Regions:
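N-terminal cofactor/phosphate-binding cores enriched in small/glycine residues
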Residues: 12
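ATP-dependent carboxylate activation and anion-phosphoryl transfer catalytic cores
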Residues: 7, 15, 20, 27-273
């Protein structure tokens, strides 16, 4: 209660061991705080086996911005650019893009350089992502994801660096083959996650895919494990694929994405296409 008063309402209670948008609860009044903590602890224990929770200031109109980094064991670290992952449902990302529109370059350079420096100081090795909430020209650190993320292709598309390949080379003890000044970004990329779920209620839609056709064309990339007659199980995340569109401009990337989604066929189950 004392911490919430100092931070100021609204606050958000988060599960320490959580992820994927689960184990979070927003609290607007002091009267609701203790029950929210209790409920979130119970949810965290059931979902993650860890009842530990923590509290943050809740931002009312933030954007979800993240910085991609690569670091090797030789104290070299670079940041590859930012991604805007603000389009979400149930605190889970649905549409991601790079670069993030409308954020002053000086602010992005400052936060990107800090992320690279932090990676060096903690001795980080591999691919990683620093996640932030962004509001009123300020970045608020959320967490660092120490892995390759679903949305990494939009960064690859705009700077030409294969993040998975670099991660393997780093794991083999190799030095990064480039420095910060060598990284040049070009164009715009957007990713849409394709989920097996009702597009209106978000209820999962497992079952057999009776027909499947992936889109193609200039600037289009599709990452998916499914095929015709594949059975989507009910036990895991509902994502069955992702479509990435690249263009010289944001408008071109959006236009290509719209065409790609109109061409994509996934029948037998419901999807968010």
């Amino acid at each position: 209660v004392r911490i919430a008063r100092a931070v100021g309402y609204p606050v958000i209670i988060k599960a320490s061991g959580g992820g994927g948008g689960r184990g979070m609860r927003v609290v607007h009044t002091e009267a609701a705080l203790l029950s929210a903590v209790t409920l979130t602890r119970g949810e965290a224990q059931a979902a993650f086996g860890n009842p530990t929770v923590y509290m943050e200031k809740f931002l009312t109109t933030p954007r979800h911005i993240e910085i991609q980094v690569l670091a090797d064991e030789h104290k070299n670290a670079v940041w590859l650019g930012e991604r805007d992952c603000s389009m979400q449902r149930r605190h889970q990302k649905i549409i991601e893009e790079a670069p993030a529109p409308g954020i002053p370059p000086r602010l992005l350079t400052r936060i990107g350089d800090r992320c690279a420096e932090a990676s060096r100081k903690i001795g980080y090795r591999g691919a990683g992502t620093f996640e932030f909430l962004y509001q009123d020209d300020e970045f608020y650190f959320i967490e660092m994801n120490t892995r390759v993320q679903v949305e990494h292709p939009v960064t690859e598309a705009t700077n030409g660096i294969d993040i998975v390949q670099q991660q393997i080379r780093i794991a083999a003890g190799q030095k990064l083959a480039f420095r910060q000044r060598d990284i040049v970004r070009k164009g715009h990329a957007i990713e849409c996650r394709i989920n097996a779920e009702d597009p209106y209620t978000f209820v999962p839609s497992p079952g057999r895919i009776t027909s499947y056709h992936a889109p193609g064309g200039p600037g289009i990339r599709v990452d998916s494990h499914v095929y015709q007659n594949y059975v989507v199980p009910p036990y895991y995340d509902s994502m069955v694929g992702k479509v990435i569109a690249y263009g010289d401009t944001r408008n071109q990337a959006i236009a290509r994405m719209r065409i790609a989604l109109s061409e994509m066929v996934v029948e037998g189950i419901r999807t968010n296409i």
